[in-house]
């Protein structure tokens, strides 16, 4: 009967090799999918950044006109909706990545892939918080400038209000009461009345928008704060690596320079030795000749 052990061993090795290939391929596919998701998030963040710039432009147009066109305000509202929708989508994806990393960490998987995912997640979270902070600052600035326009219109009508009084009127959230109070105090022009009413409505919308962003900010900003040191360490290591490479280049240049000088000195010493030997040989020759 023929011994089948070598064949079985070969088959087992072949199976093990196939399994290793399958695991490697699955791993590669997983990281490919992850990096694809990273690029999608980066693109979404870049899209929000562009929308924020458009929002700022619309803010400037609205503030520069006493009664801006409805089209501009509609465009601004659409931009705000798109930013919030995209931001919530990004937030969901970042949460999913965070949970995936936590699961792998709890399973004692501390592979290079996990560290890469953690780093990418931290970098993306920071970029996301940065762009949303810029958006929030634009909203707050628009609110303050709109409030300033209302104050100026009130001053034109002869009514002076403090910041506290204006804030109290704005926080009431009832434009009709707000305007009726103004009318009862002074005879106001229709144009000034329309602008005050328009600015008041803008501020009411902003209040809602800023409140909606608050939860997202608290959630993402806290994560970035806890993970920030890791990102800073990575950035520090990269900078140190670059400095080390530059230092190594300088040291290499110095070594080559010193080596060149040393080689030149060797040739000079050799030439001097040869000259001395030649002189000694000449002296000895002359002495013997006598």
Curated annotation (Swiss-Prot):
Pfam families: SNARE, Syntaxin
Record's subunit section: Interacts with SYT6 and SYT8; the interaction is Ca(2+)-dependent.
Its membrane topology: Single-pass type IV membrane protein
Regions crossing the membrane: 267-290
Role: Essential for epithelial morphogenesis. May mediate Ca(2+)-regulation of exocytosis acrosomal reaction in sperm.
Residue ranges annotated as Cytoplasmic topological domain: 1-266
Swiss-Prot/TrEMBL keywords: Coiled coil, Membrane, Phosphoprotein, Transmembrane, Transmembrane helix
SMART domains attached to this UniProt entry: SynN, t_SNARE
Localization per record: Membrane
Tissue expression profile of the protein: Heart, spleen, liver, and testis.
Positions of modified residues (Phosphoserine): 14
Parts forming coiled coils: 69-106
Gene Ontology cellular component terms for the protein in this record: basolateral plasma membrane; cell surface; cell-cell junction; cytoplasmic vesicle; endomembrane system; extracellular space; lamellipodium; membrane raft
Keyword match Transit peptide: no
GO function terms (MF aspect): calcium-dependent protein binding; SNAP receptor activity; SNARE binding; structural molecule activity
InterPro entries assigned: SNARE (IPR010989), STX2_SNARE (IPR028671), Syntaxin (IPR045242), Syntaxin/epimorphin_CS (IPR006012), Syntaxin_N (IPR006011), T_SNARE_dom (IPR000727)
Stretches assigned to the t-SNARE coiled-coil homology domain: 193-255
Protein name as annotated: Syntaxin-2
GO BP term (any one): vesicle docking
SUPFAM superfamilies the UniProt entry points to: t-snare proteins
Primary localization: membrane
């Amino acid at each position: 009967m023929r011994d089948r052990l070598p064949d079985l061993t070969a088959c087992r090795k072949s199976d093990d090799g196939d399994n290793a290939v399958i695991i490697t391929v699955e791993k590669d596919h997983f990281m490919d999918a992850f990096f694809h998701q990273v690029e999608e998030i980066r693109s979404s963040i870049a899209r929000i950044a562009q929308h924020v710039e458009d929002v700022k432009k619309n803010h400037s147009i609205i503030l520069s006109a006493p009664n801006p066109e409805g089209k501009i305000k509609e465009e601004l509202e659409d931009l705000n909706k798109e930013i919030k929708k995209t931001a919530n989508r990004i937030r969901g994806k970042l949460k999913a990545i965070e949970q995936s990393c936590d699961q792998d960490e709890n399973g004692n998987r501390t592979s290079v892939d996990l560290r890469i995912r953690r780093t990418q997640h931290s970098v993306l979270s920071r970029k996301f918080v940065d762009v949303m902070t810029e958006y929030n600052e634009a909203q707050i600035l628009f609110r303050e400038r709109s409030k300033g326009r209302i104050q100026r219109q009130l001053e034109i009508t002869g009514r002076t209000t403090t910041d506290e009084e204006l804030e109290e009127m704005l926080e009431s959230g009832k434009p009709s009461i707000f305007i009726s109070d103004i009318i009862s105090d002074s005879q106001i022009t229709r144009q000034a009345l329309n602008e005050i009413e328009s600015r008041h409505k803008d501020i009411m919308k902003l209040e809602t928008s800023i409140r909606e962003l608050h939860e997202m900010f608290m959630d993402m900003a806290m994560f970035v704060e806890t993970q920030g040191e890791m990102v800073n360490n990575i950035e520090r290591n990269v900078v140190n690596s670059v400095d080390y490479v530059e230092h190594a280049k300088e040291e290499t240049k110095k070594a080559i320079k010193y080596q060149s000088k040393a080689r030149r000195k060797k040739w000079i010493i050799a030439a001097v030795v040869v000259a001395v030997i030649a002189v000694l040989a000449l002296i000895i020759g002359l002495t013997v000749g006598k």
